[in-house]
């Protein structure tokens, strides 16, 4: 622990598993106070307890697509830990279908979480953190799928590409208005998560050098450490940028 995030107060959506949990863990390790969110209370409470006590981390049940719930989430976080300085919009879902085969219901559900949820968190984050001298940072989780197309991820591609460009717009607006709020995107490649563990042969397939030139997939902490940097004052001149962590996938 080096206290890189001492004095920071962060909200991490989808923070109960995988990448989100790793981000929350590293944030606390580096001195931040954190609220993680998720849809399932039992999973969320267990996740928070695995990281630390209620003096440093708490769980709030919240669906990122619930617009009204965002204000309550900020209020609850600030009552517990003080002014929010950092928002990590990490919550997301996937539908493995082509554009042709994706139903309207599937399309709207995915975008409600992956895009609307990020929009709600970004908008309210700006409104609540601007002009306060907090060194505020909004970190929006996109994906390598925000850069390249995948024939079986039509809706997911759309959502992650939209997050990438929307974040640039927000970053420019905040910079030009001297809000002291930075907005950046993180683009994971293939990462070892519970979902990957549950899919037989998935890790081996993703580790092929034609997909990941480094020959192995990443770990959640590979993404978490990038987020620590972006949440810290070390990244005070970084905004509107894309941070790709993919073992060389998009360099091909």
From Swiss-Prot:
It comes from Lentilactobacillus kefiri. PROSITE patterns: ADH_SHORT (PS00061). It is an enzyme of class 1 (oxidoreductase). The active site is at residue 156. Keywords: Magnesium, Metal-binding, NADP, Nucleotide-binding, Oxidoreductase. Optimum temperature is 50 degrees Celsius with acetophenone as substrate. GO terms for molecular function: metal ion binding; nucleotide binding; oxidoreductase activity. The gene is adh. It comes from the Bacteria. The keyword Oxidoreductase applies. PANTHER family: DEHYDROGENASES, SHORT CHAIN, ESTRADIOL 17-BETA-DEHYDROGENASE 8-RELATED. The lineage of its organism: Bacteria, Bacillati, Bacillota, Bacilli, Lactobacillales. NADP-dependent (R)-specific alcohol dehydrogenase (ADH) with a broad substrate specificity, able to catalyze in vitro the stereoselective reduction of several aliphatic and aromatic ketones as well as beta-keto esters to the corresponding enantiomerically pure alcohols. CDD domains: 3beta-17beta-HSD_like_SDR_c. Belongs to the short-chain dehydrogenases/reductases (SDR) family. This is NADP-dependent (R)-specific alcohol dehydrogenase. Its EC number is 1.1.1.-.
């Amino acid at each position: 622990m080096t206290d890189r995030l001492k004095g920071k107060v962060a909200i991490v959506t989808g923070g109960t598993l995988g990448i989100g949990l790793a981000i929350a863990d590293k944030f606390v390790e580096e001195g931040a106070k954190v609220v993680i969110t998720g849809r399932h209370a039992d999973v969320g409470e267990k996740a928070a307890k695995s990281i630390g006590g209620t003096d440093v981390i708490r769980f709030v049940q919240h669906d990122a697509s619930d617009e009204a719930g965002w204000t309550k989430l900020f209020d609850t976080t600030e009552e517990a830990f003080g002014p929010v300085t950092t928002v990590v919009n990490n919550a997301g879902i996937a539908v493995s279908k082509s554009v042709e085969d994706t139903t309207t219901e599937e399309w709207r559900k995915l975008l409600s979480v992956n895009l609307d949820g990020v929009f709600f968190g970004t908008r309210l984050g700006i409104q609540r953190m601007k002009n306060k001298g907090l060194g505020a940072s909004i970190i929006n989780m996109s994906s390598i799928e925000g850069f390249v197309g995948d024939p079986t991820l039509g809706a997911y591609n759309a959502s992650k590409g939209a997050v990438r460009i929307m974040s640039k717009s927000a970053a420019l607006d905040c910079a030009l208005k001297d809000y002291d709020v930075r907005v950046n995107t993180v683009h994971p490649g293939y990462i070892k998560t519970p979902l990957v563990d549950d899919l037989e042969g998935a890790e081996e397939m993703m580790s092929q050098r034609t997909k990941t030139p480094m020959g192995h997939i990443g770990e959640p902490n590979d993404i978490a450490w990038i987020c620590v940097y972006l949440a810290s004052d070390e990244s005070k001149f970084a905004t509107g940028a894309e941070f790709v962590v993919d073992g060389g996938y998009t360099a091909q």
